[in-house]
A protein has these predicted regions:
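Rossmann-like dinucleotide-binding domain for NAD(H)/NADP(H)
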Residues: 225-227, 231-308
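Short beta->alpha connector loops at strand-helix junctions that form conserved
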Residues: 29, 49, 70-71, 87-98, ...
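Rossmann-like dinucleotide/phosphate-binding beta-alpha-beta segment
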Residues: 14, 18, 134-224
Length: 308
């Protein structure tokens, strides 16, 4: 059985041993559309991450029996055409939950605790020249007693809520699906959540309900001391409106791991704010802990072992 992974560069240095033992495994870091067509000609199992699986690509692989998505979302695959050819598509779910939850609090604590400032204070030598034992020039705040408003109370959002509880925070949420299925915490309107939360944390998928959900009007509802965190998808937040809010002091700060266009274009307004210290940006890496990538490989292997 020949197994081809067309764009494995996003997986980093993880071992593919669980997949390698299943057959003849060929792995490419990246594949252009034309390269992809050449590389799938004799494969039976196709693994992709962001490569577009078009009818043309499927037709170029006459022996293809299974498509494995090395992620949860499958919007890069023509599912209807694959089904018409009798080719099953399997994705991976839940592998990155712990990783994203931890990354969420890494960013929140960095913003709330002024970590970069204090680190610079000591390493730059400023602390060594002080005449008192501490640096009182900046203030940081405790999470205890604050309200966190979670947009999207799925697997990740609910785990964020549990950890927020451990910090002594008050939890509320907005249901992007409109079901309000979680009865453990109050489900608020988006307007009320934005107005009353000290931290707004986004953990929703990108769909017709969430695309452009947080724009200038919604950000303007937030407290001037509030933080906005987006660990969901880039298209949920208007990046220009957020950059303006950071510079104008409409909100205290923001952290983003996802963007409308990835990689982030050099002219993106978030890279040119006047107050970068109020902003934490990460290159869509919240999903990618060592353990999460290992779980992902294990899931892909299990999906192949199921057969077709």
């Amino acid at each position: 059985m020949k197994i081809v992974f067309l764009d494995a560069a996003t997986m980093g240095d993880v071992s593919f041993a669980p997949i390698e033992k299943l057959g003849d495994f060929v792995c490419y870091d990246r594949s252009t559309p034309q390269e992809a067509i050449e590389r799938v000609k004799d494969c039976e199992v196709l693994i992709i991450n962001k490569v577009l699986v078009t009818p043309q690509l499927i037709d170029a692989a006459p022996s293809l029996k299974l498509i494995c998505e090395s992620a949860t979302g499958v919007n890069n695959i023509d599912l209807e055409y694959a089904a018409s050819k009798g080719i099953p598509v399997r994705n991976a779910v839940g592998y990155s939950t712990s990783s994203v939850v931890q990354a969420t609090f890494m960013q929140i604590l960095s913003l709330m605790g002024e970590g970069p400032y204090y680190d610079s204070c000591v390493k730059s030598g400023r602390y060594s020249s002080m005449d008192i034992f501490t640096d009182p020039s900046v203030s940081w705040r405790e999470l205890e007693g604050m309200r966190i408003g979670i947009i999207g109370m799925g697997n990740i959002g609910s785990r964020v809520a549990k950890i927020a509880e451990a910090f002594g925070m008050e939890i509320c949420y907005y249901s992007t699906s409109g079901t309000g299925h979680c009865k453990e915490y109050p489900c608020l309107s988006l307007e009320e959540l934005m107005k009353t939360s000290d931290i707004v944390s986004i953990h929703a998928p990108l769909n017709e309900r969430t695309n452009g959900l947080i724009g200038a009007a919604e950000i303007a509802l937030m407290k001037p001391t509030a933080l906005l965190v987006n660990m969901g998808r880039g298209g949920i937040v208007d990046e220009k409106a957020l950059a303006d809010a950071i510079d104008n002091g409409t909100i205290a700060g923001a952290a983003l791991d996802v963007f409308v266009t990835e990689p982030l274009p050099a002219d993106n307004p978030l890279l040119h704010v006047r107050h970068p210290e109020r902003l934490r940006l990460a290159p869509h890496a919240a999903w990618a802990s060592v353990q999460a990538r290992e779980r992902l490989v294990t899931q892909i292997a299990a999906n192949i072992e199921k057969g077709w």
